[in-house]
Amino acid sequence: NAVWGGATEDYGYFPNTFKDFLKIFISADGPLLEGEPHANALGNHLGIWDFYYKKKVDSREIKIYYQHFFEDTSGLRFANKSDGLWGLELYNYINNTKILFEYLNTTNQNRNPPYVQDYYYHHYQYPAGWSYKGYTIGNPFISSGNYSNTNPSQVLHFGIQNYKNNK
């Protein structure tokens, strides 16, 4: 996903030509600014790598997954290391029940020189970022810029769901 174009009082108009769209589509670097170690891509990008393994034996099923999120090329290349959502789902290990364990980590935030921290869901050109009325869209455990300039989190989540047997 990418937000791009538009204008702000602080920065004026952002690039919005078809050529700029193509750069956004392939996440090409934008202009290199003096004093910066790397060029930023145009727009505000979010992406996710979603890996999982699922195994079913008789009526039981297990699913192990990792969702690696990124906002720039460094995250795309896994420079933010262990950040992401790790999960385990067990279905029917207890009759008609699904059990869920999840661990969310956002503490690395690509703290690897020469890059600066990612501060997930934040963007200096689009200060509202991925939010609605000040609340982050998509993940309740990551704070928006209204509440914090940084948002490292470690969260454990547990869920259980029972399915009614309709026999």
Predicted segments with their positions:
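Internal, well-ordered domain-core segments that constitute the primary functional module
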Residues: 1-11
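Outer-membrane beta-barrel pore domains
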Residues: 27-167
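Acidic-aromatic/histidine active-site loop/patch
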Residues: 15, 25
